[in-house]
Amino acid sequence: MAELHWTRQWRGWEGVAAVRWATAAARAADPPALALRGRHPADTAASPPPPRTAGARARTSGADGRRRGRPLGPAQRGRYLLRDTRQTLGREPKSFLCRLCCQEDPELDSDKDETGAYLIDRDPTYFGPILNYLRHGKLIITKELGEEGVLEEAEFYNIASLVRLVKERIRDNENRTSQGPVKHVYRVLQCQEEELTQMVSTMSDGWKFEQLISIGSSYNYGNQDQAEFLCVVSRELNNSTNGIVIEPSEKPRFFRKRALECERTV
């Protein structure tokens, strides 16, 4: 089992946190986990650490010798325990966490405490997006966090794919801000009733459905009339040159064939 302990020691009025991360790896038959324990900002550096309770310690079952951990109780103010598997930490083979917790790279000469745990001085606030990306491969950044902070942590942990994603998001946000108010391109597509489902399902490249208008039909196929519709779709005007929309070549032919020459930019 791999444990990562956070103890915050706040210095100065501005609330700068010195975060001590301690990782201790124990070999066991069960897939190891990552445990995070933090101190509440109100705790001072002079206050001694509380004794570890039975619920905070990893236990060993008698049958298979597996070690188990349990979240800390709510009575222990400001302290929490987060567990994760070694498989998640090793998702990026060249990352810092994989080399430290999974490969036990001897080149990572990190300081250790009296228990042999590694000490890493980083801010745990931005560790959530890092861990979530290792879990499911998606970049999730809440409104309280900034992309620059996540980028800094991604570079520190040497997660190259995450670094690229964060840089792309920062670049998109900058482009959106520099372009001013968002403009939209509207397109009207004419289709028959039997083609409506296919047309909607083939929309791509950021096009969104806006409105469906029934216009009737003057065509007669045998004994059954085919109703006709106008489908209004739109998308943000991102890739443009002098107001002319540049459409990707891979857009479905059906989508282009049904487009009418009545698009306008608002």
Curated annotation (Swiss-Prot):
Low complexity: bias regions: 53-63
Modified-residue entries (N-acetylalanine), positions: A2
Record SMART domains: BTB
Pfam families registered for this protein in UniProt: BTB_2
Location of region: Disordered: 38-79
GO molecular function: protein-containing complex binding
Occurrences of domain BTB (ranges): 76-174
GO annotation (BP), single: protein homooligomerization
InterPro entries cross-referenced by the UniProt entry: BTB/POZ_dom (IPR000210), SKP1/BTB/POZ_sf (IPR011333), T1-type_BTB (IPR003131)
Keywords, in A-Z order: Acetylation
Keyword Acetylation: yes
Keyword Acetylation: yes
PANTHER family per UniProt: BTB_POZ DOMAIN-CONTAINING PROTEIN KCTD2 (PTHR14958:SF22), POTASSIUM CHANNEL TETRAMERISATION DOMAIN CONTAINING PROTEIN (PTHR14958)
Name of the protein this chain belongs to: BTB/POZ domain-containing protein KCTD2
Organism: Mus musculus (Mouse)
